[in-house]
Amino acid sequence: MHRPLVFVGMSGVGKSHLSRILGRSGYRVFDVDTRIAGELASLVTPEPGELPVYALGRWMDMPWTEGFASREAEYLALEERVTAACLDEAIASVAPAVIDTTGSVVYLSATLRARLKERGRVIYFHTPESDRVRMREQYLRDPKPVCWGGLFRRVGEETPREATERLYPELLATRDHLYRVIAEEIIEGPELRGVQAPALLARLGLNTDPR
């Protein structure tokens, strides 16, 4: 029985792209984001023509809006169920498997995070500091709903933008620490940009024929 790979890291670091490469090489891919999109009806109904990711963002809204903490908790409960199901299926899979987690996997229960670490090979694709600066500037230009794990707190008369500018680097640093806690292996995200299947399999120490 194969020990499933578990890819963790910030959104946009390349987890999904690398998972798809493995999928074309015989691996069974468990895409947590896609699974969540298929179960969004429990949280929000997309408008006609609206992509699930935008419907989720519209529903969750920004961290300074009323009720955000409650909506975040509801979302994470859904992510918990989906991620646990993916892990169970990956463990039972005859074919080798890879679980493409969301960026907020580190906010799931300690029990599930420990189980991911125990039963899977957790690989953290690290976002370098230069990319974090770019992510911060992009987020400030076009803020999108993300899970903050209780970190977002405005001080005094801070505007939402001022609080976000102050706290976003802390969000990234906190996540970096939490990813490292569960990771068995850390790979610099840019290291695998543009990589093809043989090189990816070799870098991960995987058999070129997963059967």
Spans of model-derived segments:
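Hydrophobic anchor at the beta1->P-loop junction of P-loop NTPases
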Residues: 7
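Conserved catalytic segments around the Walker B and adjacent sensor/switch elements
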Residues: 27-32
